[in-house]
Amino acid sequence: MAYFMANATRENCQDECRLSPNRDAVEEDLKKIGVECTKVDFDDANVQEDLDQLIKKYNMNYHDEIHICRETMPNFDEKLKIFFEEHLHDDAELRVIKHGAGYFDVRAKDEQWIRIPVRRGDFVFLPPGIYHRFTTDRSEDVVALRLFRNNPKWTAFNRSENGDKQPIREQYLKDVSA
């Protein structure tokens, strides 16, 4: 279950970083910012049908797989640092976790971070223009299916640089305030 989180630093970002006392983020909190989460059962014989339904629902036509771990990813530490930098994209971010565990952090309307723990079978939809970041948990091993509407552009706009100036950010803010 998602929750509002305490400040995370690069040193502790792979920990839960829960507030004390804990404050869960319910489905309505995520819905308000355009985030959707569901489950995909990889042990079900119909898993491909479930994936096809997600692909159709979100009008995706391209996918790939990424394995985030020290053994398979060159410059692992640098990549994790990039993933954890607060950023946004022009396109939606859709991920299905096939193996391992990690955290997607997204900004609530009041600028607090909401942490979404993900593990095998979790599907996450982040709308275009939302500030977010990602990290693995301490296992440092995640395999994710990435779904795209077109071939990936991989353009990230960091908040500290020019993210707020992007037209997609303005559109996102309009969409979530409606």
From Swiss-Prot:
This is Acireductone dioxygenase 1. GO terms for cellular component: cytoplasm; nucleus. The keyword S-adenosyl-L-methionine does not apply. It catalyses: 1,2-dihydroxy-5-(methylsulfanyl)pent-1-en-3-one + O2 = 4-methylsulfanyl-2-oxobutanoate + formate + 2 H(+); 1,2-dihydroxy-5-(methylsulfanyl)pent-1-en-3-one + O2 = 3-(methylsulfanyl)propanoate + CO + formate + 2 H(+). Its cofactor is Fe(2+); Ni(2+). The lineage of its organism: Eukaryota, Metazoa, Ecdysozoa, Nematoda, Chromadorea. The keyword Metal-binding applies. Belongs to the acireductone dioxygenase (ARD) family. Coiled coil: none annotated. Binds either 1 Fe or Ni cation per monomer. Iron-binding promotes an acireductone dioxygenase reaction producing 2-keto-4-methylthiobutyrate, while nickel-binding promotes an acireductone dioxygenase reaction producing 3-(methylsulfanyl)propanoate. Pfam families: ARD. Pathway: Amino-acid biosynthesis; L-methionine biosynthesis via salvage pathway; L-methionine from S-methyl-5-thio-alpha-D-ribose 1-phosphate: step 5/6. GO terms for molecular function: acireductone dioxygenase (Ni2+-requiring) activity; acireductone dioxygenase [iron(II)-requiring] activity; iron ion binding; nickel cation binding. Keywords: Amino-acid biosynthesis, Cytoplasm, Dioxygenase, Iron, Metal-binding, Methionine biosynthesis, Nickel, Nucleus, Oxidoreductase. Its EC number is 1.13.11.54, 1.13.11.53. It is found in: Cytoplasm; Nucleus. Catalyzes 2 different reactions between oxygen and the acireductone 1,2-dihydroxy-3-keto-5-methylthiopentene (DHK-MTPene) depending upon the metal bound in the active site. Fe-containing acireductone dioxygenase (Fe-ARD) produces formate and 2-keto-4-methylthiobutyrate (KMTB), the alpha-ketoacid precursor of methionine in the methionine recycle pathway. Ni-containing acireductone dioxygenase (Ni-ARD) produces methylthiopropionate, carbon monoxide and formate, and does not lie on the methionine recycle pathway. Fe(2+) binds at residues 87, 89, 93, 132. InterPro entries: ARD, ARD_euk, RmlC-like_jellyroll, RmlC_Cupin_sf. Ni(2+) binds at residues 87, 89, 93, 132.
